[in-house]
Each structure stands twice: as C-alpha cells, then as structure tokens.
Swiss-Prot record:
Its biological purpose: Substrate-recognition component of a Cul2-RING (CRL2) E3 ubiquitin-protein ligase complex of the DesCEND (destruction via C-end degrons) pathway, which recognizes a C-degron located at the extreme C terminus of target proteins, leading to their ubiquitination and degradation. The C-degron recognized by the DesCEND pathway is usually a motif of less than ten residues and can be present in full-length proteins, truncated proteins or proteolytically cleaved forms.
Any one GO MF annotation of this record: EP4 subtype prostaglandin E2 receptor binding
Protein name, as recorded: Protein fem-1 homolog A
Post-translational note: Phosphorylated; highly phosphorylated in myoblasts and myotubes. Phosphorylation at Ser-108 promotes PGE2-EP4-mediated inhibition of inflammation. Dephosphorylated by protein phosphatase 2A (PP2A).
Subunit structure: Component of a CRL2 E3 ubiquitin-protein ligase complex, also named ECS (Elongin BC-CUL2/5-SOCS-box protein) complex, composed of CUL2, Elongin BC (ELOB and ELOC), RBX1 and substrate-specific adapter FEM1A. Interacts with PTGER4. Interacts with NFKB1; the interaction is direct.
Name of the gene encoding the protein in the UniProt record: FEM1A
Residue spans of the TPR repeats: 282-316, 374-407
Organism of this sequence: Bos taurus (Bovine)
Keyword field: ANK repeat, Cytoplasm, Mitochondrion, Phosphoprotein, Repeat, TPR repeat, Ubl conjugation pathway
Pathway: Protein modification; protein ubiquitination
Modified residues (Phosphoserine): 108
C-alpha cells in the first residue's frame, strides 16, 4: 500500500494518531500531495467528513492545510456522488458537529456537487432536520438552489416523506409552487410518494394543483403510483380555490411572501387544474384501477375502482362519454374499452381482457409520450413471454417500440432497452427452436427484419441531431444491438427477395457512416469481442464471420480507420481471428496498413497462437506497398512531388 492510500484509509477509519504519524514533519508540498485526491476520486478530508470523524477533519484543515472546498467523489446509498465538497458529505450523513466545524473554517454553505446539489439538499434528502435548521437558521443557506433537474430542497423533502423538514422549509419561505425542469411541483412529489400529511401541509400553504410537462396532475400522479389515500383525499368535493384550511390542519405561515396565492408561475406556463371535477375524478379512478391491475396485481381491487368511475360517469343522468379510439389495435387483441356497467361486470370472468383494459385506459389518459404507457405494454408482453406466448409478446413489444420512436428523443434509454429486450427474446426463441426442433416456437424473418429496420431508423434519427452522438455510450450500444440482430437474422432462412431486403437495410446503416466508441465503424465492431457484451443475457457471439461477410457484401470499407488509425484488420488481429482476417483481405483490406503506433495487423497477432502461422503477409504485399513503407521509414519528403492518390496510399502505410 502506498503512502497516499494509507493516509486516505486512516482518515476514513478515523485513526487520528496514525494519520499524525504519517503526516507529521512533511513539507507543505508533500502535505498538499498526500491530502489530495486518491485514485477513486476522493480526498482524506472528504471521506473523514462523510464518516463524521471531527478530530480528523479539524487536523487535516488546521494542521495540514486541506482545502474545505475541494470536491471529490464519495459513495452514498450505492451511488457515487461526484464533485462533492466535504460540507455536502457531512450534511448528507447528518454529522452536525462536522458541519459546524467546516462552516467555522470557511466552507461555503451553498457549494454544490457536479449535479448542482447543495449541502442543504443533501440534508433534506436523508431527513437530517437539525442539520437543515443549522444550515438555514445560522448560515442562511439558499432554499431555492435546485439540482440539475430543477428539483428543490422542498421537493425532495416531500418526496422522501420528511414532514418536519418540509414544514420548516415552508416556514422559512420556500416557494411552494416552484417547478422542476419537467414541470412537476412539490405536490407531485407528495402524490408520488404517498405523503398525505405533507400534501395537506402544502395545500394549507396555497399550493396549486397544476399539470407537469407530461400533462400529469398530482391526482393522476397518485393514481399512477397507486397511492389510494392521496386519490381518495383529492377527489373529495372541495371547491376549487378554497381559502379555508382543511379540518384539523394547522396552516403554516411562511416568513416570506414568495408562496402567496398571487405568485406567478416561473418559466413555461402550465395549465392549472381542478382536482375535484367529475371528469378528473373519473380519470383518476380509472387510472388507479389500471395501476391495481399491472403494478399491484389486484384485479378485484381494480374492479372496485372501475365501478366507482363508471358510477361517476353516469352520475346525475349526464353521461361522460369516453373518446372513441381512431382504430382498434392488434397488439391489444382488438379490445375496446368497456362503456356500461354490464360490460364492466363481465370482465371478472376474463382476466386477460381486464389486463387489456388497463393498457387501453393508461394510453388514453396518459398518452403515448408518457413513459409509463410504453413501460406497462412491455411489462405485459414480458409476462406473456414468460408463459410461452411469444407471438403475443412480440406484438405488444412492437407496438411499444413504435410508440417510443414516435414520441421519445432518439437513443432514449427506454427505446434502447426495448431493442435489447427484442434481441434477447429472439436469441432465446432461436435457441429454443434449435433444441426442440419443430416443437420449438417458430420465429419468422419478418419479426427479426422489422426490428432491425427500426434499429437502423433509430441510428438515422440520432445522426440527424445537432450534437454528434459518436462518443455516446448509448449510441455505441445501439450499434452493437443492431449487429446482434443481424447476427440472429443470419440464422433464419430467407428467400432471395428477403435477402435483398436485408442487404438494403444494412446498406442504409452503412450509408449513415455511424461511428461508435473510439471511432469504430460497424465493421470494426463486428470483429471486436467486446461487442458480445450488450446486456445481462447472451445474444450473439463476436467476432462474427457471418456478420462481417454481410457488412462487406453491402459495401463496408475494409480499410476504414478508427481514432487510433486501426483498420478492422487490426482489430481482428487483436482478437486473433485469422478466418475473419482472410475474409477482410479477400475483400481488399490492406495487409500492411499501419495504425497510429506504426503496427501492421500481422504484428498484432499473438505469437503463441496458431493464428500467426495461418496468415502469410507476403502473399498480399506488393512492391508498391514496400516502396511506400520505405518512404515513410526513411522520412523521404514526397508531398507535392507525387499525385494526391499516391500520397493517400503512402499515408496508409
């Protein structure tokens, strides 16, 4: 163990005497080095503050000159928080004595992490009321500094259910109607977490019932998350804009005027909504029933809520009609929503139809752009797959994928997850078919080809974005999944017309000239073993000669270069794949092309393996190649003296 790590570990474990022994007598430069960041990104002061070692903290600051503002990486609840100052770590862990000490020594009370989280927000997150009181009351911590998502201290207190912290923040003038980047308010956070008492507290402070960026009211948010207590409370008949406090609820009086009912919403305007209208109550109960079906798996509970919704629809002789769908959906087995009490009661004998009703209701109320809509369609498909009904699963997943591609941004994590699920499912079904023969589940060319086309479309959409996605891990993963789908497609028999369609689709992909990590083309990725790892379950195995041949047949450039000037031949050599190397060479790959380190592919082959003996480089090296390498090796000037095509040829070597 080196000295730097020993200092860090001593600070982490609170071993002051050992720390003093390690650091005493050191020069200022040595102390600065030893109290700086370790390999994991943390510092001794940061880790000591995180674990509440007051004596170590004060020693490092007072005697060793450690900076109270230096940020670093620290672990909390299984996550790595980057750029966290020591005060943030102490506040998050609830170490009030360390918080006091750091502030006395000049720490900034509003210093943020990389995600713009303040020490106050950290204390609010885990419910450290005394730390919150000290930061706000003694050091005037800013209540309104939001994190990168626009989420404030009041919002996180409400979401985590810390009632006394929420009450204190409101007393100090926290803005009760502040909006996050996605338009949600503290009321939404209460509804999503089921904190009825805090929700009542917010309403007592004139919190407004408004829609977020997805069009969700707090009432609908409670329905989606299945918090019946919130739904029941909000659908009670209470006049909109009622200024009277709720029975038994002490109204909090904010010290400032920022949460007054006249406070205008900041930024984008959102529609205010009345939570107690008949239509809102009906939709909330219907959506709550859908949540009972898919999330709580309680069909009888769902029927109870749907009955109440149906009664409200017919209340007073004025029927509230449901909008007619433009067309019935194959994925939903052409189901349509029930409209009468008799149709509703008949559902009790048909659980599968109840599950389709839940999907229909969710899509109608939340709309196709809400993440829950496609999520539960995929969830229902997965349940069918688990029971062996792969055909029904594929239909639902295709419908969800279309919904995601039409409504979400390119390379959305949800869309990527759908593509990966398809690849894993197709791999499983093909293996099942291989093992069971005709008894296995059949999977057709159309199923695989349809998803491959959608995958190529996703890459095309991503490349149309203003920002270049080439360095994005998500983009690399999308390319890898497409290659896995192509790998699986090679295992399915197809007609000449289908083969032509497959080649057209691959040509579309190559025409986009997509680049993954390190500038890898699809051909580079097809010869790289790392492409195998795309998810939890195995799909295809790479390097893959079959995929390489398809890519080459469709026009992939065998001499394309990555950021290190490696050709696919170099990557194939690093993976010791002589069969693939021969295929690349036959397609015109230059055997003696060098990379940025002046290595040819042949030189990268492992000497210990037979691969090197199966490749004969001199069979593919021309006199022109040798002359080009001689020019480069001897640094003979050639630019401007020979044709441009020859200059490019020499640079290849």
């Amino acid at each position: 163990m080196d000295l730097h790590t020993a200092v860090y570990n001593a600070a982490r474990d609170g071993k002051l005497q050992l720390l003093q022994k390690l650091l005493s007598g050191r020069s200022r430069e040595e102390l600065e080095e030893l109290t700086g960041e370790v390999a994991s990104g943390g510092t001794p002061l940061l880790i000591a503050a995180r674990y509440g070692h007051l004596d170590v903290v004060e020693y490092l600051v007072d005697r060793c000159g450690a900076s109270v503002e230096a940020g670093g990486s620290v672990h909390f609840d299984g996550e790595i928080i980057e750029g966290a100052p020591p005060l943030w770590a102490a506040s998050a862990a609830g170490h009030l004595d360390v918080v006091r000490s750091l502030l006395r020594r000049g720490a900034s009370v509003n210093r943020t992490t990389r995600t713009n989280s303040t020490p106050l927000r950290a204390a609010c997150f885990d419910g450290h009321l005394e730390v919150v009181r000290y930061l706000v009351g003694e050091h005037q911590a800013d209540l309104e500094v939001a994190n990168r998502h626009g989420h404030t201290c009041l919002m996180i207190s409400c979401y985590k259910g810390h009632r006394e912290i929420a009450r204190y923040l409101l007393e100090q003038g926290a803005q009760v109607n502040r909006r996050s980047a996605k338009g949600n308010t503290a009321l939404h956070d209460c509804a999503e977490s089921g904190s009825l008492e805090i929700l009542q507290l917010l309403l007592g402070c004139n919190a407004r019932m408004e829609r977020d960026g997805y069009g969700m009211t707090p009432l609908l948010a409670a329905s989606v998350t299945g918090h019946t207590n919130i739904v029941e409370y909000l659908i009670q008949e209470q006049p909109a804009g009622d200024e009277q406090a709720q029975p038994g609820l002490a109204r909090v009086q904010p010290q400032g005027a920022r949460s007054s009912p006249e406070e205008p919403p900041s930024g984008e305007s959102y529609e205010s909504c009345c939570p107690t209208s008949r239509e809102a109550a009906v939709e909330a109960l219907e959506l709550l029933g859908a949540t009972y079906v898919d999330k709580k798996r309680d069909l009888l509970g769902a029927l109870k809520h749907w009955r109440r919704a149906m009664e409200l629809r017919h209340q007073g002789g004025e029927y509230l009609p449901k909008p007619e769908p433009p067309q019935l959906v194959l994925a939903y087995d052409y189901s349509r929503e029930v409209n009468t009490t008799e149709e509703l009661e008949a559902l009790i004998t048909d659980p599968d139809e109840m599950r389709m009703q839940a999907l229909l209701i969710r899509e109608r109320i939340l709309g196709p752009s809400h993440p829950d809509t496609s999520y539960y369609i995929r969830y229902r498909g997965a349940v069918y797959a688990d029971s062996g009904n792969f055909e029904r699963c594929i239909r639902l997943w295709k419908y969800a994928l279309d919904m995601q591609q039409n409504n979400l941004e390119p390379l959305s994590p949800m869309t990527a997850s759908s593509f990966l699920s398809f690849a894993e499912l197709f791999s499983y079904v093909l293996q099942d078919r291989s093992a069971k023969g005709s008894l296995g589940t059949p999977i057709g060319f159309a199923d695989l080809m349809g998803v491959l086309c959608k995958g190529v479309r996703e890459v095309e959409r991503a490349l149309q974005l203003p920002k270049e996605p080439g360095d994005s891990a998500q983009f690399t993963k999308a390319l890898a999944i497409i290659l896995h789908l192509l790998y699986l497609l090679e295992k399915v028999e197809c007609t000449p017309d289908q083969e032509h369609l497959k080649h057209q689709t691959v040509y579309r992909l190559l025409k986009c000239a997509p680049r993954g990590k390190n500038g890898f083309t699809p051909l580079h990725m097809a010869v790289d073993a790392e492409t195998t790892n795309v998810g939890r379950y195995p799909v295809g195995r790479f390097p893959s000669l079959q995929v390489v041949k398809v890519l080459l047949d469709c026009g992939a450039d065998p001499d394309s270069r990555d950021f290190d000037n490696n050709t696919p031949l170099h990557i194939a050599a690093q993976n010791n794949c002589p069969g693939i190397m021969n295929a690349l060479i036959e397609a015109g790959a230059h055997m003696d092309a060098t990379n940025a380190f002046k290595k040819t592919a042949y030189e990268l082959l492992d000497e210990k393996l037979l691969a090197k003996s199966t490749i004969q480089p001199f069979n593919y090296v021309t006199l022109q190649c040798l002359a080009a390498r001689a020019l480069d090796k001897n640094k003979i000037p050639y630019k401007g003296f020979i044709p441009e095509e020859l200059e490019a040829f020499i640079e290849l070597h």
